[in-house]
């Protein structure tokens, strides 16, 4: 499947359109309840294959899902418009008061309010953000009424198209709303050029996601987290959004990234520093009469002095006579076949870290070559956008 290039309708801040019942909100300043010491995330439910009705799932998880309210600066010229209240969702990660939400929900602020279903409200500090995965971690400040109930985060690698999923969040500020649907697709790379990022292994679902849902959990029928709801797809240059096209970051990204955000406040993503495109059958036949079904990633451009550049990977070029010289076609990474750009980025995200060596196999001038390179940290989006590359580099 090709890279999907879109904008995310609900990936950005949205003003408050509804609020939780203010009469039920309790100030955290007057609460003095001992914090539970253990930070261990609970194991899965005892029954190895439980499946609950939707109402039971809601009862099981509703106390663990929170509304996230942030004050975001929007204008320096108009004092009356300097702060806008933005809404999102989140869920309890552990008993130490860590809450997971979407990074874009808390972009532009360090302090937010988290409100539980019983109306209890607490101030929370953003302690870690990763714009490349759209994951953020908040720390509730002060003591909390009663024990926190973390949600179980399940491995998302075995998800299948057609499985039932449930989303719980706060669309338009409406408290703890449940929607459901099915998994429509998994495992593709979602590219968002206007902010210079992409998300690998995205989960697509038809569960309704609206402004205010971002950062809430996507659940399976056991009430376990399989994804983090981030937005709704609209196609660039076309009217939208389109119903039934919503996306979530996979739970495996949460399992991999959240502990590092808690410990270090940021997460370093490995990257090659190249822009490539999945080789199509038509393009394959154009390149030196390759077999129609030749598979790989055509290297379109290289980030100067990046890992791919230092390893000698060659990109496509056009000479002064307007003749195109095709770049390398990456066919494998560490001897794992590469068919799509998703395969390359997913492999290094899941199996490699910054500073580790990777072997790339590539087709060049009728033969397969192999080169080794050391992965470096992906630069922040604002720096990446200044590299002169039209698409986010892998």
Which residues does each PLM region occupy?
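Soluble non-cytosolic domains of exported or imported proteins
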Residues: 48, 52, 84-87, 153-160, ...
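A conserved glycine-rich beta-strand in the N-terminal activation segment of trypsin-fold
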Residues: 46-57, 72-96, 120-123, 149-152, ...
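C-terminal recognition in membrane/secretory proteostasis and scaffolding
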Residues: 1-35, 56, 125, 139, ...
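Conserved active-site neighborhood of the chymotrypsin/trypsin-like protease fold
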Residues: 42, 73-74, 92-176, 336-341, ...
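Terminal peptide-recognition signature
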Residues: 63-68, 90, 97-101, 124, ...
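N-terminal activation segment of mature serine protease catalytic domains
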Residues: 15-79, 95, 102, 111, ...
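Short, conserved beta-turn/loop elements at beta-strand boundaries and strand-helix junctions
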Residues: 71-73, 95, 110, 129-133, ...
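Active-site loop architecture of trypsin-fold serine endopeptidases
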Residues: 75-76, 80-84, 109-112, 145-148, ...
């Amino acid at each position: 499947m090709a890279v999907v290039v879109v904008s995310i309708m609900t990936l950005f801040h949205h003003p408050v359109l509804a609020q939780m019942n203010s009469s039920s909100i309790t100030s955290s300043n007057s609460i003095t309840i001992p914090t539970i010491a253990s930070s261990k995330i609970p194991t899965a439910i005892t029954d190895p294959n439980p499946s609950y009705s939707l109402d039971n799932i809601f009862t099981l998880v509703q106390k663990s899902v929170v509304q996230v309210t942030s004050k975001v600066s929007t204008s320096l010229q108009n004092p009356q418009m300097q702060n806008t209240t933005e809404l999102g969702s989140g869920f309890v990660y552990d008993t130490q008061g860590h809450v997971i939400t979407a990074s874009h929900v808390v972009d532009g602020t360090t302090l937010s309010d988290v409100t539980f279903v019983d109306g209890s409200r607490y101030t929370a500090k953003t302690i870690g953000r990763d714009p490349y995965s759209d994951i953020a971690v908040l720390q509730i400040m002060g003591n909390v009424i009663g024990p926190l109930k973390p949600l179980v985060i399940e491995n998302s690698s075995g998800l299948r198209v057609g499985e039932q999923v449930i989303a719980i969040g706060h669309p338009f500020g409406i408290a703890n709303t449940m929607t459901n649907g099915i998994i429509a697709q998994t495992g593709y790379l979602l590219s968002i050029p206007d902010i210079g990022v992409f998300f690998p292994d995205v989960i697509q679902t038809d569960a309704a996601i609206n402004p205010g849902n971002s950062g809430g959990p996507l659940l399976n029928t056991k009430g376990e987290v399989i994804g983090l709801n981030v937005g709704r797809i609209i196609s660039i240059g076309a009217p939208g959004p389109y119903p039934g096209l919503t996306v979530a970051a996979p739970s495996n990204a949460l399992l991999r990234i959240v502990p590092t955000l808690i410990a270090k406040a940021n997460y370093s993503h490995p990257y090659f520093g190249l822009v490539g495109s999945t080789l199509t059958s038509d393009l394959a036949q154009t390149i030196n009469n390759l077999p129609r079904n030749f598979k790989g990633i055509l290297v379109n451009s290289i980030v100067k002095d990046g890992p791919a550049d230092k390893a000698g990977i060659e990109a496509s070029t056009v000479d002064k006579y307007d003749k195109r010289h095709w770049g390398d076609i990456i066919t494998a990474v560490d001897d794992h076949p590469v068919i799509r750009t998703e395969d390359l980025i997913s492999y290094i995200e899941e199996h490699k870290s910054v500073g580790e060596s990777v072997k790339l196999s590539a087709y060049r001038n009728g033969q397969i070559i192999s080169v080794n390179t050391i992965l470096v940290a992906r630069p922040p989006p604002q720096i990446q956008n200044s590299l002169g590359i039209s698409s986010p580099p892998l």
